[in-house]
Amino acid sequence: MMDWKEAEELACKFLKKKGYKILERNYRTKYGEIDIVARDGREIVFVEVKSGSGKVDPLERIDLKKVRNLEQTARFYMIQNKLKGPARVDFVRVTPEGIDHFEGIWLG
């Protein structure tokens, strides 16, 4: 089973191949952490990476509280870096079977 660092590295490579520019990794605040901050064209994308193997889908570990913390941390990042414009939260699932990218929650 891969560890979270390996999963995040694979997710970064995957996103770069899709044309994303990685801006930051493991951004932390008192609200929470964002695994990857990237740019997709004009949009800032905050990426949560989940990995695992077995019967439980890694995405099942994302609950409403986690989503709210991600949104709050993302908003803080935008303010701290004086960024305006569209932003969203995406999820990347990394399993032994492959990588899935879910473009997700729009922040505005």
Curated annotation (Swiss-Prot):
It holds the Pfam family UPF0102. One of its GO terms (molecular function) is nucleic acid binding. SUPFAM superfamilies: Restriction endonuclease-like. Belongs to the UPF0102 family. PANTHER family: UPF0102 PROTEIN YRAN. This is UPF0102 protein TM_0253.
